[in-house]
Amino acid sequence: MSDCCSPKGYRWIFSEKRAHAEARRYRRRGLDPTSRRIAELLKQQGVEGRTLLEVGGGIGAIQIELLKAGITRAVNIELTPTYEGAAQTLLRETGLADRVERRVMDFAEATREVEVADIVILNRVLCCYPDMPKLAGAAADHAREVLLVSFPKERWWTRVVISLGDLALRVGRRQFQIFLHAPDKIIATVERHGLKIVSNETSFFWQVASLRRTALAPRSGHA
């Protein structure tokens, strides 16, 4: 991982306090708009009997909704352990703890340790990782059928927001950086790994792309 983003920086941004706040918000309001749209797109394509891998899924809210909709098993991967307490509490509350495996690791650096899944989700993750091609490519390789990825769209206001956020982080001497990876480069990267875009939607800030594999991968094994 780049020197711009240390484990300490990730733990400060994605803290236990933030995790518990997100869990409380999910209990009250359900999924946020971007996450809700991702879940809707996947349900439209069919999730019954499928397996799920989510990289940077946080408290696991999307996983919970998709497990209720028919996903058989889910794996969540986080860079830091700070979300584990809040996530495990939610899983116990929903009775889904035995269907989710949560792992703490740098997915892009340890891809061989993770099995492929029918569906892979990268929701607002690429903007927090310096090496977009490595992470996006690894996610694409692990998607047997479908990859859902969301990222900031490239507009002047997203550049302003991200620049101000980075300035605040530098002033506060936080070892973390926000990245505005070019959307066309993100999509081109995953398409080089055998996926083709089937939908590409935008909101005010976020872009959500759904990509499907052109030739299905084997039902088991590692990427």
Regions found by a protein language model. Name each.
Residues F176-G194:
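Short alpha-helix
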Residues T158-Q175:
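Short, glycine-/aromatic-enriched active-site segment of Class I SAM-dependent methyltransferases
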Residues M1-Q45, G49-G58:
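Conserved class I S-adenosyl-L-methionine
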Residues I59-A61, E65-V104:
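Class I SAM-dependent methyltransferase SAM/SAH-binding core
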Residues Y129-A139:
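A short, conserved alpha-helix within the catalytic core of class I
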Residues R144-K153:
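Conserved beta-strand signature within the Rossmann-like core of class I S-adenosyl-L-methionine
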Residues D118-D131:
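A short SAM/SAH-binding and catalytic strip from SAM-dependent methyltransferases
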